């Protein structure tokens, strides 16, 4: 009976341990966006102000071409860029 209490946690730990050994996600995985401005954030990277997904011909609309990890709110086409970099 006591061994059953430890069997499930042991299996879960083995699964979680194997997930920790996976290769880290590439930093180059980003979304091309056009932003009105890029400002330094408190965390690593830049924050994009009023960013639009796509990043095609940003100069035409007077925006800055950048590459952001995500746009918030999630699923929106326009919003704040998170962990951005200048250029594409």
From Swiss-Prot:
Grouped into one coarse class, the protein's main location is: secreted
Gene knockout outcome: Does not affect radial growth and multiple stress responses.
- Induction comment from the UniProt entry of this chain: Under normal conditions on SDAY medium (Sabouraud dextrose agar plus 1% yeast extract), hyd1F is transcriptionally active during the first days and sharply down-regulated from day 3 onwards, leading to a 99.7 % reduction of its expression level on day 7. Hyd1A is the most active at transcription level under normal culture conditions, followed by hyd1B, hyd1E, hyd2A and hyd2C in order.
Family, per the entry?
Belongs to the fungal hydrophobin family.
Signal peptide coordinates: 1-21
Q: What is the gene called?
A: hyd1F
- The protein's name in its UniProt record: Class I hydrophobin F
Disulfide bond positions: 30-67, 34-58, 35-51, 68-84
Native organism is: Beauveria bassiana (strain ARSEF 2860)
List where in the cell it is found.
Secreted; Secreted, Cell wall; Vacuole; Cytoplasmic vesicle
Keywords of the record, alphabetical order, are: Cell wall, Cytoplasmic vesicle, Disulfide bond, Secreted, Signal, Vacuole
> What is the role of this chain?
Aerial growth, conidiation, and dispersal of filamentous fungi in the environment rely upon a capability of their secreting small amphipathic proteins called hydrophobins (HPBs) with low sequence identity. Class I can self-assemble into an outermost layer of rodlet bundles on aerial cell surfaces, conferring cellular hydrophobicity that supports fungal growth, development and dispersal; whereas Class II form highly ordered films at water-air interfaces through intermolecular interactions but contribute nothing to the rodlet structure.
């Amino acid at each position: 009976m006591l061994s059953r209490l430890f069997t499930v946690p042991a299996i879960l730990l083995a699964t979680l341990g194997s997930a920790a050994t996976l290769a880290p996600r590439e930093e180059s995985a980003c979304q091309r966006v056009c932003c009105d401005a890029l400002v330094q954030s408190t965390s690593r990277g830049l924050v994009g102000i009023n960013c639009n997904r796509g990043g095609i011909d940003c100069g035409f609309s007077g925006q800055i071409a950048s590459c952001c990890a995500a746009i918030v709110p999630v699923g929106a086409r326009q919003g704040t860029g998170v962990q951005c970099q200048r250029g594409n």
